[in-house]
Amino acid sequence: MNENQKSFDSDKSESEDEQKNGRVKVRSRKTDDNEGYTWEGEYQRSWDIVQEDAEGSLVGVIAGLIQSGKRKRLLRDTTPLQRGIIRHMVLVLDLSNSMEERDFHHKRFDLQIKYASEFVLEFFEQNPISQLSIIGVMDGIAHRITDLHGNPQSHIQKLKSLRDCSGNFSLQNALEMARASLSHIASHGTREVLIIFGSILSSDPGDIFKTIDALVHDSIRVRIVGLAAEVAICKEICNKTNSSTKNAYGVVISEQHFRELLLESTIPPATDSAKTTDASLVMMGFPSKVVEQLPSLCACHSIPSRGGFHCPRCKAKVCTLPIECPSCSLVLILSTHLARSYHHLFPLKNWSEIPWSANPKSTHCFACQLPFPKPPVSPFDESTSSMRYACPSCKNHFCLDCDVFAHEQLHECYGCQCSGN
């Protein structure tokens, strides 16, 4: 009897003994090298990471985890840099068969549509005078989903109408169509491409290195968010087209990381000083809103409406702002759009966290006037955070919610505005 037969008989006898004792041995289909998908780790023995605070309560621990996550998102580089606030971006979606994989809690395709919709809203919230176009790639062919314009609702409607995935992905075809869409952009606007790449291969019809050289010649920046693994050609594309931007290529490790990598592209890129030309004025129009008694066709969509905005140059009516006038090509915006884009040039400084050891005297938040937590009784907790955050300019103390609101929405300090700084 050989060794294989002996091992088989021993396994068989072991299983028979277990069945007699009323125990059934369940064998896992997963090996030690492959313990499961990444999202499953969030639900396996999650009670092991629960820890009580000094008073035996879980409320303080949960609040601390939430606050640490908020603070991590706020700690950004606030160095004032020259940035291109008039942006033109092409968002490329992967609609190949690889997006049917379920290595996240949801399918890659569903997660892509969800976070792409959030990206569109956040992009126009942070860059109101910019324009966006969407391209989808399936069966190795690039399809234009939306044209280059500044209406976020139109982009989201087209995204939600996508259903099918098929074939392979083609980096070269996607980049060539994106380059053709951005070729007519003036020099004062940025040219950017953001690719969601869920495959590990690219079915290209020609030499992609010639396409990379053309992108560098046309000053087009490419950022790629990978969903499967790091691909060498993607890294080379990002390195060659982003001379001043680091970490332009990232591979997601979780659903939250996927969202964070996408939203990083909402911040305008820094301008390369070596390629910067002399500053020039850009002509823009500030139209007046009109309300008509009888509906008339707009110049942008040819849809009858009673209200809109009249171009100050050619008097053509458009539905929404910002937009480029379809008749005279004048950029039509509101003054609030410029104000919302201005904060990227001079970002609000990060507020420092005040520990109990600093003996803070403030009892209420300067902005919302809610009371701060009381000092700890035991000296062991003096090294923990006091839930106070101080502005380096006005020295006032604020709570975490006001800190988040000031940096993500208002982009101004409450104390500095009150003191006139």
Curated annotation (Swiss-Prot):
Modification type Phosphoserine: residues: 15
Domain VWFA: start-end pairs: 88-267
Segments for region (Disordered): 1-35
Function summary: Component of the general transcription and DNA repair factor IIH (TFIIH) core complex, which is involved in general and transcription-coupled nucleotide excision repair (NER) of damaged DNA and, when complexed to TFIIK, in RNA transcription by RNA polymerase II. In NER, TFIIH acts by opening DNA around the lesion to allow the excision of the damaged oligonucleotide and its replacement by a new DNA fragment. In transcription, TFIIH has an essential role in transcription initiation.
SUPFAM superfamilies attached to this UniProt entry: Cysteine-rich domain, vWA-like
Name this protein carries in UniProt: General transcription and DNA repair factor IIH subunit ssl1
Stored InterPro entries: C1-like_sf, Ssl1-like, TFIIH_C1-like_dom, TFIIH_SSL1/p44, VWF_A, vWFA_dom_sf, Znf_C2H2_type, Znf_RING/FYVE/PHD
Organism expressing this protein natively: Schizosaccharomyces pombe (strain 972 / ATCC 24843)
Keywords: DNA damage, DNA repair, Metal-binding, Nucleus, Phosphoprotein, Transcription, Transcription regulation, Zinc, Zinc-finger
Primary localization class, coarse: nucleus
Gene that this polypeptide is encoded by: ssl1
Subunit structure: Component of the 7-subunit TFIIH core complex composed of XPB/ptr8, XPD/rad15, ssl1, tfb1, tfb2, tfb4 and tfb5, which is active in NER. The core complex associates with the 3-subunit CTD-kinase module TFIIK composed of mcs2/cyclin H, mcs6/cdk7 and pmh1/tfb3 to form the 10-subunit holoenzyme (holo-TFIIH) active in transcription.
Listed Basic and acidic residues bias regions: 1-21
GO biological process terms on file: nucleotide-excision repair; regulation of transcription by RNA polymerase II; transcription initiation at RNA polymerase II promoter
One Pfam family hit: C1_4
Family according to the record: Belongs to the GTF2H2 family.
SMART domains (UniProt xref): C1_4 (SM01047), VWA (SM00327)
